[in-house]
């Protein structure tokens, strides 16, 4: 590495600004500011069409016209590339090469399958190939073209003196390439991998690959070979099968073949084959001025008839409703009903044809019906309607089968199984059944003539699955599914005139509706013209604006440099080494970027697995339909990460472990069923992982295998995985926001002050219904979520229409249950309950009429009736006996008796020492210890007894029975006065006498629960949001020292938030200093209580002891939570009234908002199949913006105004994480300062702007991060160092093929990036006020605000250094104004008169009341700002 550059990043040296050379893009035009409402308007884009095509096509035609002279049309054959000495030799006519040794080595039986229609065309095909460079074969499915045409070529070459022959045949799908190659070998009696073999990806048969003369491969394999070799001359014949599918790879392959035919490969023969090809279009594409490729047609000639009917011909079904609209494709309810009527017509028709006279329910219903529907949603709708009809009419006997691309192997086998006698098999299928699956017993087809097409907006990269009318080609393909074994009928659910006049003949090619990144990269690799020039030569050229947008995206992901030969070009850019890698990986560019960053951060294998999992669809089985248990498996594998991508990685590791352990097939199937996984998809994923590993090995993308560079710690790996995920899917950044409007007060007021992390609620309950009678019924609303009733408390809002369900905070789970980690502090049961709402958002509850209920409780003597109002029974609480800290006590001294973590420990005030000693003496009296437990059945959950603790018996309650060892039964007990839980044998338990029970059963615990206040675990050292062991050890060491001094911050739900005093400072601050914790706000309830306690303690000296005691008892009484008495419900026969509850809901439910310009005004949702579909505020007390990253985004809605995020990941809850990730991984960024130029307040990121016009190059993908914590100049220096190191890993000089960095350099890069990143993410940052501005999305001239940093790699830098604007101290008069404003707020703190709303100038927050002002003064934001301006704090 350059020492000067390393010195630049040495932070031990003083940072001195120097005049540095300008970057390759400079700007000197003044910035402009747009109005804020301008940001809400859609971005105006210029759509440039296909006018650019004409000049390039004419030029190519001239090149094509010179391909073949009369002399070169002789039947002379090709020689191999190895025989050529130079490029100039390509133009010469090749010498004839024989291969007699090869033909003698293998058996060639080339005169078979004469019955196939293609055989009759053999001579015609041979003559056409001899006389033309390109031949088109159009043959119906089943005519034999795929398996017979290549052997015909062999026969032709054998007859020509056994000339050399090397044939390659492409297939659009890998399974087809493999199966057809094996079938040809079987037919010709060749050993697989010799004469005939296959290659899919990098996987190929290696038996005798040198002898392979007939290679079946995927389209992508041949395309890569040709792009790398830049010639066709490795082959004598190239056969492109299924050309009609018109995928991007096929269309670009046609471009490459036509160009190479016209330049250096004029003697190679090309055969294009398809069943539904447009021969005229292809013939014109390869034609020159003197000739055009001939078309040879081979028809199949069916033995059975296929009758076609249209909607207007089906008089018997009486279809009502509107006519079809070409602009509004879809299926109405009447359309579904008409399909069902058609099924009934088919049944009646079959009965009549057989003339059996059988009744409807006796009909055999032999022929299956195949219904073509556009998507899984429509399949579900059709299935539901058929089920409803079958339920209402038992004689309707249907055997319904689904068929779509995500179905499991078991579901696929079901398609081919015969139905039970008397049942009609109805297959509801998407277009996957057009060609991929043939079901022999299908006699009828119902075709809605619809399909779903994935279309991508190249300007935003948002994809949308659009409903569209199918082409006539598709419809004919569907009709071809019948008439093979018997006569068939096709019912098209459109009118005949609509079909004939409105439906297009062919589908829209993929190149016109999908991203073009891979095509552009192939064009750059091919080096035969610019991307615009090459794509202009496509069979269906894309719009110029789509190509330009693709160029911008490739610049954004690092595949292209911003400039071309040193100059910015909106239509081109020099390819980077990243782009070279991306062109060689069969992945989306963002997934390739994931692997590249995985290499940088030494997580390449994890990145490969995730990339493969995102490429292979359907790993989880139809999670939207199988219920909560299936969905919960996402959480099992995500393991608290909040990331679908981490879940994929863990699924694969589990699958791999299962395979390595040799699990039997049946056991594997059971494992997959249990976790709702598709073995077929996992197997496909495994093949892709192996392929990617091999490709990465060839590209030298290998992990560092030294122990010091391997990330072994799961916590560190989890953070780094999130880092590379954020880097890979830039700019798909979203900010999480609370759904509850207003401040934190609403979060608690809606649920009556209960814990939002454990509580859900239902609405639409009637207060007069006496809800406490139905608590058990409410608990039974969660069976599908598998939440046991004993694990929840049900309470009711006084005077409201809500039912609250609070899940118990017990760390001990019932036996047989698996603990599943979820993000943050929230209970897993909350996620389970909320997921239920997606399946059913209304729940019925049968209750009694109010008057009958009143009489019922009166007769049963349940509770009390006061003035006609029922008071439910409750357990009295003697608040004067509670050990909770008094309202007037700020400091309490005592002992910590038990520590679960820094977030949960138990404290025993020293004032109870004598009480504890007396109790212990009483309990350990020999007379009290005589009640030994002789029968384990006498010990039940919740029973109070005596249990041995540290040699003495203390009172305890039974938590649960440990039944693992039936011979030696043990019990988990909780020591009431110490807080710890122990597993004890029966011999160490004693039953309490009646005298002891009378005295101590109702005595509250002589301790209280605590947690550390104003801090939370630091994400960099925390797993599952748990406190790190080192922090817990520090607390343990403090507890062992004896008495400790607590400062009570607040008391909420009987848990005290405390600071633990040390000789200097307190433990809370020490944990922050040691980076084991970070500062955080307390939640609303805690701040309210703290404010109340402070004000009461301030006036303590003015209140008498008796009054203080009275106030404290009222205070403690108000702190007691509502009780669930678990009353028995009334008899069902008396519950005649029905209430429909809505929910459950949570006050922590969140929404996400886009940071991208193009997503600002759109509604954002998360995919229902994502682990984050139920998105909650996992740290409700934390006011920092939390970041969500999506691997892909789809758009829906009438104006594509609803975005759905797929494969999402919640980023670590680290303040400033979004800003740091943006600055590290964006192409360019501007840091914007506040008006005083004292701090950075926002980041604008994108690929940059035009230096003269100041217009953004890629406005749609510009994103803004508004800062809520301090990012300073030294942070940006660290970020620049990381960017430089990433660039260094891949930097290569112009013209070089490989990076210049060697192994030692890579070790240095790794050892530099990790510490720098750790410093950035673990830094304790001050909170700052938000400063949103109307010019946030406006690029500005930064020349006057700071010098640009040097660009070490100049224009060959993917991550150029960020300019660091110089900051200044705030002016003194501004500081004095802020101090005055702060003092004024403190003066108002105890004000009780009329209050005029005011603004906190430090935090830019509007305060409407004194109560709001008091709570604001307690926030970390305000406290940090006070320190910043030097406000004196008492």
UniProtKB/Swiss-Prot annotation:
Q: Which UniProt keywords apply?
A: ATP-binding, Cytoplasm, Developmental protein, Differentiation, Helicase, Hydrolase, Meiosis, Nucleotide-binding, Oogenesis, RNA-mediated gene silencing, Spermatogenesis
What PROSITE patterns has UniProt attached to this entry? HELICASE_ATP_BIND_1, HELICASE_CTER, TUDOR
Under CDD domains, the record lists: SF2_C_RHA
Predominant subcellular localization, coarse grouping: cytoplasm
For this UniProt entry, which residues form the secretion signal?
Answer: none
* Nucleotide-binding found in the keyword field: yes
Motif DEAH box positions after renumbering to this chain: 241-244
Q: One Gene Ontology cellular component annotation?
A: nucleus
Is tRNA processing there in the keyword field?
no
Where does it live in the cell? Cytoplasm
Residues where ATP binds: 139-146
Domain Tudor spans what residues? 936-999
Q: What SMART domains does its record include?
A: DEXDc, HA2, HELICc, TUDOR
What's its EC? 3.6.4.13
The protein's annotated catalytic reaction(s) are: ATP + H2O = ADP + phosphate + H(+)
Residue span(s) of domain Helicase ATP-binding: 126-295
InterPro entries named among the record's database cross-references: DEAD/DEAH_box_helicase_dom, Helicase-assoc_dom, Helicase_ATP-bd, Helicase_C-like, P-loop_NTPase, SNase_OB-fold_sf, Tudor, Znf_C2H2_type
Name of the molecule in the record = Probable ATP-dependent RNA helicase spindle-E
Question: What does the organism's lineage look like at the top?
Answer: Eukaryota, Metazoa, Ecdysozoa, Arthropoda, Hexapoda
Q: Give the gene symbol.
A: spn-E
């Amino acid at each position: 590495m350059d020492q000067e550059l390393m010195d630049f990043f040495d932070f031990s040296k003083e940072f001195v600004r120097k005049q540095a050379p300008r970057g390759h893009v400079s700007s000197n035009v003044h910035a402009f500011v747009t109005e804020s409402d301008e940001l809400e308007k859609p971005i105006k884009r210029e759509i440039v069409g296909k006018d650019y095509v004409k000049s390039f096509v004419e030029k190519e035609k001239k090149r094509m016209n010179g391909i073949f002279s009369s002399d070169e049309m002789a039947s002379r054959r090709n020689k191999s590339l190895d025989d050529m000495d130079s490029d100039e030799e390509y133009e010469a006519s090749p010498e004839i090469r024989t291969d007699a040794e090869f033909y003698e080595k293998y058996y060639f039986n080339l005169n078979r399958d004469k019955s196939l229609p293609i055989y009759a065309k053999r001579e015609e095909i041979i003559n056409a190939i001899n006389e033309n460079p390109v031949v088109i074969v159009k043959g119906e499915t089943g005519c034999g073209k795929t398996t017979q045409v290549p052997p015909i070529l062999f026969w032709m070459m054998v007859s020509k003196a056994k000339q050399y022959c090397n044939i390659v045949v492409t297939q659009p799908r890998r399974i087809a390439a493999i199966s057809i190659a094996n079938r040809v070998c079987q037919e010709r009696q060749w050993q697989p991998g010799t004469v005939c073999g296959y290659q899919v990806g990098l996987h190929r048969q290696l038996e005798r690959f040198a002898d392979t003369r007939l290679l079946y491969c995927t389209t992508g394999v041949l395309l890569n070979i040709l792009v790398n070799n830049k010639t066709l001359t490795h082959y004598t014949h190239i056969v492109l099968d299924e050309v009609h599918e018109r995928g991007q790879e096929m269309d670009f392959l046609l471009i490459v073949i036509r160009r190479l035919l016209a330049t250096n490969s004029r003697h190679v023969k090309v055969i294009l084959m398809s069943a539904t090809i447009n021969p005229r279009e292809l013939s014109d594409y390869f034609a020159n001025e003197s000739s055009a490729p001939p078309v040879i047609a081979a028809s199949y000639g069916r033995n059975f008839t296929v009758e076609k009917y249209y909607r207007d011909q089906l008089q018997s079904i009486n279809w009502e409703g509107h006519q079809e609209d070409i602009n509004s494709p879809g299926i109405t309810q009447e359309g579904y009903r008409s399909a069902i009527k058609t099924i009934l017509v088919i049944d009646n028709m079959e009965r009549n044809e057989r003339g059996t006279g059988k009744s409807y329910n006796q009909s055999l219903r032999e022929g299956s019906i195949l219904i073509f529907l556009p998507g899984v949603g429509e399949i579900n709708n059709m299935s539901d309607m058929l089920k409803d009809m079958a339920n209402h009419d038992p004689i309707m006997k249907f055997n319904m089968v689904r068929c779509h691309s995500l179905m499991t192997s078991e579901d696929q086998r079901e398609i081919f199984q015969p139905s039970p006698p008397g049942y009609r098999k109805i297959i509801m299928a998407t277009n996957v059944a057009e060609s991929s699956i043939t079901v022999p017993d299908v006699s009828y087809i119902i075709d809605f003539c619809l399909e779903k097409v994935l279309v991508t907006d190249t300007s935003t990269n948002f994809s949308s699955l659009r409903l569209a009318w199918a082409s006539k080609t598709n419809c004919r393909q569907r009709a071809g599914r019948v008439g093979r074994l018997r006569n068939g009928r096709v019912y098209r659910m459109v009118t005949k005139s609509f079909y004939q006049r409105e439906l297009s003949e062919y589908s829209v090619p993929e190149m016109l509706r999908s991203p073009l990144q891979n095509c552009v990269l192939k064009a750059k690799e091919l080096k035969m013209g610019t991307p615009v020039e090459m794509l202009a030569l496509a069979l269906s050229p894309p719009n110029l604006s789509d190509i330009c947008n693709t160029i911008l995206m490739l610049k954004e992901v690092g595949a292209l440099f911003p400039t071309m030969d040193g100059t910015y070009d909106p239509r081109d850019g020099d390819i980077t080494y990243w782009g070279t890698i991306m062109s060689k990986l069969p992945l989306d560019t963002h997934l390739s970027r994931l692997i590249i960053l995985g290499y940088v951060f030494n997580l390449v294998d994890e990145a490969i697995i995730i990339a493969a999992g995102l490429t292979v669809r359907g790993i989880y089985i139809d999670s939207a339909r199988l219920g909560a248990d299936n969905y919960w498996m996402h959480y099992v594998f995500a393991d608290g990460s909040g990331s679908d991508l981490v879940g994929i990685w863990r699924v694969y590791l589990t699958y791999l472990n299962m395979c390595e352990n040799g699990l039997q097939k049946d056991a594997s199937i059971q494992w997959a069923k249990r976790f709702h996984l598709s073995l077929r998809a996992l197997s496909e994923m495994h093949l892709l992982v192996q392929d990617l590993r091999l490709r990465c090995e060839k590209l030298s993308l290998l992990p560092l295998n030294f122990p010091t560079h391997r990330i072994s710690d799961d916590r560190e790996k989890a953070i780094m995985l999130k880092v590379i995920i954020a880097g890979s899917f830039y700019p798909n950044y979203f900010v999480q926001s609370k759904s509850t409007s207003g401040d934190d007060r609403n979060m608690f007021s809606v649920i009556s002050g209960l814990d939002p992390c454990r509580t859900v609620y239902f609405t639409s309950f009637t207060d007069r219904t006496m809800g406490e009678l139905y608590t058990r019924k409410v608990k039974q609303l969660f069976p599908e979520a598998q939440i046991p009733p004993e694990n929840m408390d049900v309470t009711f809002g006084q005077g409201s229409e809500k039912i609250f369900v609070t899940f118990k905070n017990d760390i001990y789970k019932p036996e047989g249950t698996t603990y599943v980690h979820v993000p943050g502090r929230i209970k897993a049961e909350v996620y389970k309950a909320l997921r239920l709402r997606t399946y059913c958002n209304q729940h019925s509850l049968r209750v009694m009429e109010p008057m009958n209920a009143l009489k019922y409780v009166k007769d049963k003597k349940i509770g009390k009736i006061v003035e006609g109002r029922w008071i439910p029974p409750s357990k009295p609480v003697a608040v004067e006996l509670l050990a909770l800290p008094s309202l007037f006590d700020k400091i309490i001294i005592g002992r910590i008796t038990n520590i679960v973590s820094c977030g949960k420990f138990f404290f025993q005030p020293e004032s109870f020492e004598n009480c504890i000693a007396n109790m212990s003496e009483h309990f350990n009296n020999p007379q009290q210890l005589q009640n030994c437990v002789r029968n384990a059945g006498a010990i039940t959950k919740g029973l109070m007894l005596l249990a041995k603790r540290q040699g003495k018996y203390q009172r305890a309650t039974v938590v649960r029975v440990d039944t693992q060892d039936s011979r030696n039964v043990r019990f988990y007990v909780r020591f009431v006065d110490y807080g710890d839980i122990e597993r004890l044998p029966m011999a160490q338990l004693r039953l309490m006498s009646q005298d002891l029970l009378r005295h101590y059963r109702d005595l509250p615990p002589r301790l209280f629960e605590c947690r550390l206040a104003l801090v939370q675990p630091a994400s960099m050292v925390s797993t599952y949001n748990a406190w790190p062991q080192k922090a817990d050890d520090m607390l343990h060491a403090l507890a062992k020292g004896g008495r400790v001094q607590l400062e009570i911050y607040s008391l909420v739900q009987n848990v005290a938030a405390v600071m633990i005093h040390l000789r200097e400072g307190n433990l809370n601050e020490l944990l922050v200093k040691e980076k084991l914790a970070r500062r955080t706000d307390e939640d609303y309830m805690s701040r309210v209580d703290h404010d109340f306690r402070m004000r009461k303690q301030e006036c303590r000296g003015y209140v008498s002891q008796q009054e203080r005691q009275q106030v404290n008892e009222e205070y403690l009484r108000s702190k007691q939570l509502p009780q669930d008495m678990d009353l028995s419900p009334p008899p069902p026969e008396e519950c005649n009234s029905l209430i429909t509850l809505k929910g459950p809901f949570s006050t922590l439910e969140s929404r996400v908002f886009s940071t991208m310009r193009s997503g600002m005004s759109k509604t954002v949702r998360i995919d229902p199949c994502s682990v984050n579909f139920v998105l909650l505020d996992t740290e409700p007390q934390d006011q920092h913006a939390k970041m969500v990253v999506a691997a892909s985004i789809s758009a829906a809605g009438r104006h594509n105004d609803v975005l759905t995020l797929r494969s999402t990941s919640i980023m670590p809850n680290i303040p400033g994480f979004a800003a740091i990730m943006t600055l590290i991984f964006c192409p360019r960024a501007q840091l914007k300062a506040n008006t005083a130029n004292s701090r950075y307040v926002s980041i604008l990121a994108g690929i940059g702007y035009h230096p003269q016009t100041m217009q953004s190059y890629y406005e749609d993908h510009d994103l803004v991060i508004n800062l809520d914590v301090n990012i300073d100049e030294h942070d940006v220096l660290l970020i620049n160092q990381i960017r430089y190191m990433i660039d260094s890993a891949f930097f290569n000089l112009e013209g070089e093929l490989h990076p210049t960095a060697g192994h030692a350099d890579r070790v240095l890069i790794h050892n530099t990036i990790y510490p720098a990143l750790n410093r950035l993410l673990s830094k304790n940052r001050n909170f700052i006020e938000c400063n949103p501005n109307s010019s946030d999305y406006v690029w500005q001239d930064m020349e006057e605000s700071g010098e640009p940093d040097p660009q070490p790699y100049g224009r060959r830098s993917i991550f150029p250094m960020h300019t660091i604007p110089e900051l200044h101290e705030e002016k003194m008069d501004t500081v004095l104004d802020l101090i005055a404003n702060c003092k004024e707020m403190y003066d108002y703190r105890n004000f009780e008169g009329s209050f005029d709303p005011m603004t906190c100038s430090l935090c830019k927050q509007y305060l409407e009341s004194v109560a709001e002002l008091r709570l604001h003064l307690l926030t970390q934001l305000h406290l940090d700002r006070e320190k910043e301006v030097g406000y004196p704090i008492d």
